[in-house]
A protein has these predicted regions:
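A short alpha-helix capping/helix-coil boundary motif
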Residues: 7-11, 30-33, 59-62, 131-139, ...
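Trp/Phe/Arg-rich N-terminal binding region typifying the photolyase-homology
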Residues: 1-128, 215, 279, 391
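Glycine/tryptophan-enriched, flexible segments
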Residues: 88-90, 111-249, 352-391
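Charge-dense, low-complexity intrinsically disordered segments
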Residues: 13, 17-21, 166, 264, ...
């Protein structure tokens, strides 16, 4: 069963939102596999509670099985379905799936949540050694209802094709091996692009951890960061309500210049590495992680624009948008988050270019006019911006 929730879809102002298309194409692929077993997905476009109520009227529902979701709305939604199910004597079973360790499974020696990544990751790895990943194939245990059902179309859902190409699910062993040495260079095809699959559950976090073990500690740590930010979301729910992790940063005075924000959004800041990242995001729904740090630092520290503005723009554009990771990344850049970059660390876009795109291959791809007269002048002077933010 899959439910397209109007509460979520109605908030997507871009009717060519690629995430809806990705989900629908993934469901179609799964439906082809189900057809081989003479069954289909049951897909609804409705309020989730109402969809289950209709399902209960149509079938003899005895139990519901789903996986944990950690965001605020999802938790409230699942609680309402659980409460309804109990009135119908339907058991509601929910399981951990999208993380390796959740909630309070990784705590400090004082039984408190970690707010710094390094000790968290150390304890995470210790627990993995005590609780190794075990395969539980389900094919021989599955019991399918014979049926043939059709999926809704993008048009029925109120959306249209995006034109964005979606990454595959595969990852080469050689890429994982070379990840530490190659990961910071955006012109290289050195990252897996699996984040969208992790976000929507089309690849298993457990299978990726198994691929990383003994091959790349750095690649494994990137997966652990996901668990870490889910951990922060669970233990410090105020971050899901527009507040800084470090609440004193909520008193920060921002310039919030709307003209400069629009220039940042459109990749017209006059800083080629920043503009390349934003244009890549706008065109593909993806941005290299090193460049994400550069553009976020630029918005917050060069332009003194509230990190929440950037967080919201990324939430709209990123194909792999995940609230906890997006929020954590933006608060890291702003210095307001847990284990954040220190406030005095201000990325110099020019030096970042020299280090990570010295041949300008990435910039030439996305900002081909950067050496032409029609390319905009920098909207802010780096040294002056650095002095201003540190004042």
């Amino acid at each position: 069963i899959f439910i397209f929730d109007p509460h979520i879809l109605s908030k997507l102002s871009n009717k060519a939102d690629a995430r809806v298309e990705f989900i629908l194409s993934s469901l179609a692929f799964l439906n082809v596999q189900f057809a081989q077993r003479n069954t289909s997905l049951y897909v609804k476009h409705d309020d989730p509670l109402r969809a289950f109520q209709q399902l209960e009227e149509e079938f003899d529902v005895q139990a519901i099985f789903t996986n944990h979701d950690y965001e605020r709305y999802a938790d409230e939604r699942d609680s309402s379905i659980r409460n309804w199910a109990s009135t119908k004597q339907i058991t509601f079973n929910t399981f951990k799936d999208q993380v390796i360790f959740e909630k309070s499974e990784v705590l400090s020696g004082q039984n408190t949540p970690y707010t710094v990544f390094t000790p968290y990751s150390r304890r995470w790895k210790e627990r993995l050694g005590l609780h190794p990943i075990i395969q539980f194939p389900s094919e021989d245990l599955s019991n399918y209802l014979p049926c043939t059902l059709t999926l809704p179309t993008l048009d029925v859902l109120g959306f249209q094709a995006s034109g964005i190409a979606f990454p595959g699910k595969g990852v080469d062993h050689s890429l994982i091996q070379a990840y530490q040495a190659q990961r910071d260079f955006p012109a290289k095809d050195a990252t897996s692009h699996l984040s969208v699959h992790l976000r929507f559950g089309t690849v298993s976090i457990r299978s990726l951890v198994q691929k990383a073990l003994g091959v790349s500690e750095t690649w494994l740590n990137e997966l652990i960061w996901r668990d870490f930010y889910f951990n922060i979301l669970h233990h410090f729910p105020h971050v899901s309500q527009g507040s800084a992790f470090r609440k004193e940063y909520d008193r920060m005075e921002w310039r919030n210049n709307e003209v400069e924000f629009e220039a940042w959004c459109q990749g017209q800041t006059g800083y080629p590495i920043v503009d390349a990242g934003m244009r890549e995001l706008n065109s593909t729904g993806f941005m290299h992680n090193r460049v994400r740090m550069i553009v976020a630092s630029f918005l917050v520290k060069h332009l003194l624009i509230d990190w929440r503005w950037g967080e919201a723009y990324f939430a709209e554009k990123l194909l792999d948008f995940d609230f906890s990771a997006n929020n954590g990344g933006w608060q890291w850049a702003a210095g307001s988050g847990c284990d954040a970059a220190p406030y005095f660390r201000v990325f110099n876009p020019t030096l970042q270019t020299q280090k990570f795109d010295k041949d300008l291959a990435y910039i030439r791809k996305w900002v081909p006019e950067f050496q032409e007269l029609n390319y905009p002048q920098p909207i802010v002077n780096h040294e002056q911006a650095r002095v201003r933010v540190l004042a």
